[in-house]
């Protein structure tokens, strides 16, 4: 399926860093070799974190990484969770979120800084009850592993905001499973 849209190269640069940390530079070469086997000319070399890249290439690379190393969909959760730790852009974003209400208000704008696909908005934010629901609409139906990446990324960002490791994030609705949209439910 061809996905129309763009995503910042940050996803690829942090994925490359993750592969190097877990599998060394040889791991990156294995992924690039697999990509060439399917007749694609992608290379991690020269990828810029701030440039826009076709979303279908980024999704393809993320899925091929799982295949090359025999990793499960849940591994993408771990990758997404570790990305904000290594990303200067994510660290700057976290500094801009001075409180949960500000984070809730500015999430849609930050989503736009990363991709032109879909819309991300909070549909429930109850700080007293310690729960929130984030909805992703108009995002293409892609492999569940991509949503696991989002879940990991969102968990790490939210943990940093609430300064708690007791946070749970679940995908409670998923376009991948036939729902109209994807929702991430947070409880802490």
List the predicted regions and their residue ranges.
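Short, non-transmembrane amphipathic alpha-helical segments
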Residues: 148-162
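N-terminal low-complexity or simple alpha-helical regulatory segments
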Residues: 1-89
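Amphipathic interaction/junction segments at domain boundaries or subunit interfaces
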Residues: 49-149, 166-167, 173
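Beta-rich nucleic-acid/ligand-interaction surfaces
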Residues: 167-188
């Amino acid at each position: 399926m061809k996905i129309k849209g763009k995503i910042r190269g940050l996803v690829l640069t942090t994925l490359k860093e993750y592969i190097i940390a877990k599998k060394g530079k040889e791991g990156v070469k294995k992924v690039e070799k697999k990509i060439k086997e399917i007749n694609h000319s992608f290379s991690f070399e020269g990828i810029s974190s701030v440039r826009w890249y076709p979303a279908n290439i980024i999704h393809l690379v993320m899925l091929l990484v799982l295949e090359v190393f025999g990793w499960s969909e849940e591994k993408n959760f771990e990758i997404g969770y570790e990305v904000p730790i290594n990303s200067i852009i994510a660290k700057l974003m976290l500094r801009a979120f001075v409180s949960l209400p500000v984070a809730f208000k500015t999430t849609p704008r930050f989503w736009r800084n990363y991709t032109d696909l879909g819309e991300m908005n909070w549909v429930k934010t109850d700080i007293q009850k310690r729960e929130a629901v984030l909805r992703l609409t108009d995002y293409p139906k892609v492999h569940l592993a991509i949503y696991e990446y989002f879940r990991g990324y969102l968990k790490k960002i939210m943990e940093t905001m609430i300064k708690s490791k007791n946070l749970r994030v679940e995908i409670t609705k998923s376009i991948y499973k036939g729902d109209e949209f994807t929702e991430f439910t947070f409880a802490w």
